[in-house]
Regions:
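A generic structural signal for short coil/turn motifs at secondary-structure boundaries
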Residues: 98-102, 135-136
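Conserved catalytic cores of soluble enzyme domains
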Residues: 128-243
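Glycine-rich phosphate- or other oxyanion-binding loops that anchor nucleotides, phosphorylated ligands
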Residues: 89, 102-106, 144-147
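Conserved small/polar residues in nucleotide/adenosyl-binding loops
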Residues: 248-257
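Short glycine-rich loop/turn motifs
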Residues: 74-78, 87, 122-123, 149-150, ...
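A structural preference for short, pocket-lining loop segments at secondary-structure junctions
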Residues: 80-94, 109-136
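N-terminal amphipathic, basic-rich helices that act as targeting or association modules
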Residues: 2-77, 82
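Glycine-rich anion/phosphate-binding loops
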Residues: 70-71, 100-112
Length: 258
């Protein structure tokens, strides 16, 4: 039997990278009526326009048996593509991989495309669906997420930034999502918390539910974090596409030349 060629190996790795988490995580995702990161990017961008970066990156943590689970991509899909023929940079957290938590390589990957967007003066679109910091990676993860926040702050006022919150987002992910110019929360699944909702006493004892404390209506009417509420995921993508991209490109160019 002939040995597999290097191109066959590459195809196998690419197929593995395109597999979102394990089967149980994927079933849980489907049960909630949510889509995978790649499906969301496919819906957001023009067909066939997505160019992915760092699809084979893996975390390097060894504690807490993390060496036994090293999925390709480390729970985030990132790259650039087109919306109505205009170039944008985008990323999407994959809740089916480590619950979308942000580890060292996950954060570095997002930081890389954010820096590319700033240097290229392109809009940055983030699809957020993650449980914040990946505690298993400890201070290594903290350092990388700190660098990411620095880059996002540097992007503020330089390029248009969009955050689509399509799941329960907590901790550093919520903080990062809130730095955008346009924050769009999905009415069904979009929630934002500065700490895990499962650690909040009022939620634990049933005094309030997650939506009342961190849901889309709460952030649109009281906290002011949300600019718009989307009826569902497709509506969130449509809203993003309808925002005048030509205007945002013009403003980015003017900011660069000033």
């Amino acid at each position: 039997m002939p040995e597999a060629s290097r191109s066959d190996d590459l195809d196998a790795m690419r197929q593995l990278a395109h597999t979102p988490g394990d089967s149980s995580s994927l079933r849980e995702l489907r049960a909630e009526g949510k889509k995978t990161a790649r499906e969301r990017i496919s819906q957001l961008l023009d067909k066939g326009s997505f160019v992915e970066v760092d699809s084979f990156v893996q975390h390097r943590a060894g504690d807490h048996n993390m060496h036994l689970h090293r999925p390709l991509g480390d729970g985030v899909v990132a790259g650039h593509g087109m919306i109505d023929g205009r170039r944008v940079v985008c990323f999407a957290q994959d809740y089916a991989v480590f619950s979308g938590t942000m580890g060292e390589m996950h954060a570095k990957k997002v930081a890389k495309v954010a820096e590319f967007a700033e240097k290229s003066q392109l809009p940055l679109i983030g699809i957020w669906d993650g449980d914040g910091q990946r505690v298993e990676e400890g201070v290594t993860s903290l350092g990388a997420t700190g660098e990411l926040l620095d880059i996002l702050v540097a992007c503020s006022g330089r390029i248009p930034m969009f955050s689509l919150v399509l799941g329960t987002v907590s901790g550093v992910s919520a903080l990062a999502a809130g730095l955008s110019d346009f924050v769009i929360l999905g009415s069904e699944h979009g929630r934002m918390f500065m700490r895990s909702p499962y650690m909040i006493p009022e939620i634990i004892d049933g005094t309030v539910d997650e939506d009342a404390l961190g849901g889309a209506e709460q952030h649109a009417s009281r906290s002011g974090v949300a600019c718009m509420i989307a009826d569902d995921e497709q509506d969130a993508f449509d809203i993003t596409a309808e925002i005048p991209v030509s205007y945002t490109h013009l403003r980015a160019h003017e900011t660069k030349t000033d």
